[in-house]
Each structure stands twice: as structure tokens, then as C-alpha cells.
Amino acid sequence: MSASSGEKSQGRRFAEQQMHKHGWTEGKGLGRRENGISEAIKVKVKCDHAGVGHNSAEQFTFHWWDHVFNKTASSISVEADQDGVKVNRTKDDDAPVTNKKPRKALSNRNMLYGRFVKSATLLPGGEQAVKEPSSSESSDSSGDEDEKLDLSSATKMTDEDLRKVCGGRTAHKGARHGLTMSAKLSRLEEQEREFLAKYGNKQQKDKVKAVTPEITEDLLGKNRQQNDSGECPETNNSHKKKKKKRERVDSEREEEEEEESQENRHEEEQVPLSEEEIKSSKKKKSKKKHREQSASPQEEQVTESTDFCIKPKKKKKKKNKSE
């Protein structure tokens, strides 16, 4: 289960996480003695119609055009005569030209009994058994015979050998003159730098913009919590004013009640009031009327001011019907 070069699937990542919990590390085998497999079993999906043992890389390794050219050249002989040059065909081989690798098994397909396996030879004195070669010898012999049938000259040459033969030249037309792809690579690097300089700052700004709304939402949430926990400052001031006003009104009412009680007592006793006492009583009555008239508009102003700071009602969360 060692890490592969490609991306790991979700199931494989989950399995590795579970094994890491139990002390497994990459490169170790499974089992108590750690002598089991160290790599995951990979499923290979067969998506073609080729048979068992088919080599899909054969189309890249087998140089069929070279094989066909050498095969046709070997079946032709050129002779020089007095009259000129004669071209004779040495072999009467009518095999079709194909891009598939030649094999011995395919050449015996049209035989009458080619599909049967020979086990013994019938003789006058009895049967003579055929010696069956071992599997390794048969595979080696079949492989050697198939290689002999392949007439392409580039089969045993690697890419490095071909490059040496060609003097280090590649398919690039200017490579034979010492030209390389350095100019094109430098242009691509310049384009990448310009792209980063042009759009790199915009991407950073977008990230900052994406972060700032989250910060503002957090601040708004904190302010809402503070407002929910405490009252508005305007309402606090209005409550204090109302309290002071009530205390003042209560004290004035007590004074008025005392004065009325004194007047009633004087009337009962029929004691004549002095001019100063009469003037003071008139002043108090006029103040009382003025206070009653000014009290009503002030109360309206207080109610209007308190309407501006009303606590928002908390929305009740709707319960899901599924619950």
C-alpha cells in the first residue's frame, strides 16, 4: 500500500487512515510478522476485445513497414545479363501484407489437421510416443522462431542506439543544424510571468474580499448580542427622566394636600386669612394649572422617542416535521 505517483481514490485513503490508527506505516507488510503484501491489490479493467496474452504495446515495438520491405526484398533477386537487368522472384509466397507481427502458430492455421495435437506415431510393431518438450523449452523455441520470422532491422535497437546512429538528431527539423527549443520555452516563461503579474493581485484581492464579509458578520453578531443583553441608551435616559418627574410630582402633590388641609382647617375655625396667604394660594393654583397643561405634550414626546429603540423580536425556529 505504498503511495503511488497518481491521486489516490477515496476508498484507498480511508483504508490507509484506518491502518495508520493501528500502527501501520507505508512500506510495511501485512500480518503479525509484517511478511504480507505491502502494496494494494489493483483491479485491471479490460476494455478491449483482444484475447488473453495480447500485448497492447506491440503496435509501437513492431516495425511492420521495415519487416514488409525486408521480406519483399529477400524474395526478389536482381541479375545482370547482356540484355540488361532481370528481376526474378525467388519465393512463391502469397502472404498478405499486414501490420501484425508474424507467428508460427498463425502460419499453420490452414493445415488439415493443424488444430490437433500429435501424441504418437503408428508403426507396424506398435506406437511410438512423441517426446513432449518442457514448457520452458517450448516457450523459448516458439519465441526464437517468432523472432526469426520478424525481418525488421530495428527490432533490437533501443532509442539510445537510434539516437547515436542518427548523430543525436531528433524529428525536429532544425535540430540537425544545432537549433533547440530554448526560444519557445523562454516565450512561454514570459507569458506565465505576465499572467501572474496581471491576475495574481486580483486573486489576492478576491480572497481579501471574501474574508472581510465574514469579519463584518462576526462584529454585527457581537453587537446584536450586546443589544439583546442590555437596553438601548435612549430608553435608559427616558426611564431616568420619568423617575425624576414622578418624584417631583409626588412631592408637589404632598405640598398641595398639606395646604388644602390648612385651608380647610382655617375655614372650619373661621379664622380670617391674611393677604400674603391669599396671594400664595393663588400663585400655587396658577402653577398647578400650568403644570397640568405642560405635562401632556411632554408625555407624548417621551412616548415618541421611546418608539425609535424597540428591541427586535427574536424569530422562533420552526421545528422540522420530520422531528
Swiss-Prot record:
Protein name (Swiss-Prot/TrEMBL): G patch domain-containing protein 4
Comp. bias regions, Basic residues: 281-291, 311-323
GO MF: nucleic acid binding
Stretches with biased composition (Low complexity): 131-141
Compositionally biased intervals (Polar residues): 294-306
Compositionally biased residues, Acidic residues: 252-261
Signal sequence range: none
Domain G-patch: 11-57
InterPro entries, alphabetized: G_patch_dom, PINX1
Coiled-coil region(s): none
PROSITE patterns: G_PATCH
Annotated stretches, region: Disordered: 1-32, 84-110, 124-185, 197-323
Compositionally biased intervals (Basic and acidic residues): 9-32, 84-94
Ranges annotated as spanning the membrane: none
Annotated organism of origin: Xenopus tropicalis (Western clawed frog)
